[in-house]
Amino acid sequence: MTEQKRPVLTLKRKTEGETPTRSRKTIINVTTPPKWKVKKQKLAEKAAREAELTAKKAQARQALSIYLNLPSLDEAVNTLKPWWPGLFDGDTPRLLACGIRDVLLEDVAQRNIPLSHKKLRRALKAITRSESYLCAMKAGACRYDTEGYVTEHISQEEEVYAAERLDKIRRQNRIKAELQAVLDEQ
């Protein structure tokens, strides 16, 4: 039997006549910062944003605190309507007579109505400062007492005053809405 010559495997490669050349060290410029540095920068930016947001919210809360917190018009109507239905036309308040607060306070004392002076005052303020009440103040319109009887009519000066007051209240409501939006944002 003849043995066939098998190739011998070696770990060394034969060079093809080239002599190895010595190469210089290659310098690699890394333009991206390391991950820890990126993470640290992101955390610092996030902390700065949060600090700015909390400062803005605190400033908005401070600015919002100067406005009087009155009950809504519906709450004010529901507070006064059971005791003095003559002041209302359905659920809408009528124009109130001048000096009605003193009359209502005397009525509360006489009839022992469970309504504090503070609640009564706030309800009257909420009604008289509402947009629907101020819009109804036109020259010649009637003012009503607690029984629902006409006592006097609106003058031209009162109509002008109501229009100015309405502009002021709308401006304040717009500012309050902007401040509330700042407080509500995340």
UniProtKB/Swiss-Prot annotation:
It holds the Pfam family FinO_N. GO terms for molecular function: RNA binding. Keywords: Conjugation, Plasmid, Repressor, RNA-binding, Transcription, Transcription regulation. Residues 1-22 are annotated as: Disordered. It comes from the Bacteria. SUPFAM superfamilies: FinO-like. One of the components on the FinOP fertility inhibition complex, which inhibits the expression of traJ gene, which in turn regulates the expression of some 20 transfer genes. The transfer genes are responsible for the process, called conjugal transfer, in which DNA is transmitted from one bacterial host to another. RNA-binding that interacts with the traJ mRNA and its antisense RNA, finP, stabilizing finP against endonucleolytic degradation and facilitating sense-antisense RNA recognition. Belongs to the FinO family. NCBIfam families: PRK13754.1. This is Fertility inhibition protein. It comes from Escherichia coli. The lineage of its organism: Bacteria, Pseudomonadati, Pseudomonadota, Gammaproteobacteria, Enterobacterales.
